[in-house]
Amino acid sequence: NLLLSLLPALSLSSCRKFRSDPEKITMRPRIFLEGAAPIPILDEYDVRLVQLGTIANIMTEEPNDRMFALWFSFDRRSAMTLQKETVRNVGKRLHLVIGGEIVGVHPIEGGITDGVLPFVLSANMPEENAVYLYNELSTSLVHIRAEFESKKG
């Protein structure tokens, strides 16, 4: 009986969707292929997750000198696009563009088959700027997905 009395509350809470707040969408990441038409090969609607991390800076002998990178994970369809474009364009670079500015670069060394694309941020980007970029992107992507889902119906 207790379970039956809770069913209406459970069904209402599971139907509630996260609402998009357009004011929280401050960044729309777009990915362009170097030297190609100025049309993004992937955009903010393709991204499922972004993560922040560090990588070794190969330009210095100092082992503690790290550079920040963003790892983008894509949905299945977009991962297939990413694989196709990276297989075709070995030796070129992908640019992460936000607000008209290139903020990250990925040199294409081979096909990316796992749907995860890392972008190295500028070597002189301070930690607080990298964290700010990550936080704004994360928040924006949550609201972009909610916006997309609400328009999809």
Go through the PLM ranges and name each one.
Residues 7-8:
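Short glycine/proline-centered loop/turn elements that form peptide/ligand docking sites
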